[in-house]
Amino acid sequence: MSTVGELACSYAVMILEDEGIAITSDKIATLVKAAGVEIESYWPMLFAKMAEKRNVTDLIMNVGAGGGGGGAPVSAAAPAAAGGAAAAAPAKEEKKDEPAEESDGDLGFGLFD
């Protein structure tokens, strides 16, 4: 039941944030009740306190920026190690002009020379 309570309160917080409504425990509880989900009474209060201390929009936008991918290159992991507060702009790859590949014409490796 606790995972259902967490999920319902998470959705309620996202709805309130998206609508620009102040996030309070009463409003979270009202939304969850309107959805027909039964939760423990402490969940709305916990989520309301979390929303007071954190910017919910930043939390939503940085969901995928967290660590966890142990095989990622070091340069890509640096923004996540810095707290993930700002997403780093992807580095532009410079295209190097490579010489055109020469044909296999006369390299001395002919099979029937």
UniProtKB/Swiss-Prot annotation:
Question: One MF term from GO for this chain?
Answer: structural constituent of ribosome
Q: Which residues carry this modification: Phosphoserine?
A: 103
Under the heading Pfam families, the entry gives:
Ribosomal_60s (PF00428)
From the UniProt entry, list the residue stretches annotated as the region Disordered: 87-113
Name the Gene Ontology biological process terms: translational elongation
Q: Which GO terms describe its cellular component?
A: cytosol; cytosolic ribosome; ribonucleoprotein complex
Which keywords does this Swiss-Prot/TrEMBL entry list? Phosphoprotein, Ribonucleoprotein, Ribosomal protein
| Function comment | Plays an important role in the elongation step of protein synthesis.
Q: Which family does it belong to?
A: Belongs to the eukaryotic ribosomal protein P1/P2 family.
> How does the annotation summarize its subunit structure?
P1 and P2 exist as dimers at the large ribosomal subunit.
Name under which the protein is recorded: Large ribosomal subunit protein P1z
> Which organism is this entry from?
Arabidopsis thaliana (Mouse-ear cress)
Tell me the classification of the organism that encodes this protein: Eukaryota, Viridiplantae, Streptophyta, Embryophyta, Tracheophyta
> What gene is it encoded by?
RPP1B
